């Protein structure tokens, strides 16, 4: 309920209709990148993942800096991976407001992503080699590409 106080309470949001004029004009344009973020879990699979799956320039913002609860992180991956794939997300990002907690937050994000990848391996949806490659990509190439840092 307030900026920078850790009281991040989700509010209902809508992206699909609101972004349609922008995405119709630029969503598949060379060099266009849009990374929407939200705490509204109902939007991930209904709006953001399909938008990222369809538009070349849309990536789903990974909300780890304000959703640092393991079950919510796993729900996010489950809700977005089918449409958007792991490669159309922003990867883990953080802010420096809670500087001392950043290593712990990165650690939990890596463990949750590894848990999600392990599930895909056990279900024979990806190979172990793929899981290892993806786990590396999630902390380097994926965020660098999404934020155009390469």
What feature does the model see in each segment?
Residues 4-14, 63, 100-104, 126, ...:
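Catalytic or ion-translocation cores adjacent to nucleophile or general acid/base/metal-coordination motifs
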Residues 59-70, 91-92, 124-133:
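A generic structural motif
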Residues 1-33, 42-58, 72-92, 109-118:
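Histidine/acidic residue-rich metal-binding segments in metalloenzymes
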Residues 41-47, 67-71, 98-102:
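Flexible loop/turn segments at secondary-structure boundaries
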Residues 33-36, 132:
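Beta-strand segments within the central parallel beta-sheet cores of soluble alpha/beta enzyme folds
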Residues 44, 86-87, 104-150:
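Mid-to-C-terminal alpha-helical segments outside catalytic/metal-binding sites
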Residues 35-39, 63, 86-105:
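Short acidic/histidine-rich active-site segments
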């Amino acid at each position: 309920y307030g900026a920078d106080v850790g009281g991040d309470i989700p509010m209902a949001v809508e992206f699909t209709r609101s972004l349609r004029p922008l995405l119709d004009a630029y969503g598949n344009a060379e060099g266009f990148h849009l990374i929407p973020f939200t705490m509204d879990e109902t939007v991930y699979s209904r709006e953001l993942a399909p938008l990222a799956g369809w538009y070349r320039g849309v990536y789903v913002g990974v909300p780890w800096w304000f959703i640092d609860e393991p079950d919510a992180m796993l729900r996010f991956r489950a809700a977005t991976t089918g449409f958007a794939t792991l490669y159309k997300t922003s990867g883990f990002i953080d802010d420096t407001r809670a500087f001392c907690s950043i290593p712990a937050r990165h650690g939990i994000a890596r463990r949750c992503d590894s848990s999600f990848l392990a599930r895909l391996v056990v279900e024979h949806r990806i190979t172990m080699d793929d899981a290892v490659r993806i786990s590396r990509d999630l902390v380097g190439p994926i965020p660098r590409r999404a934020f155009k840092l390469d």
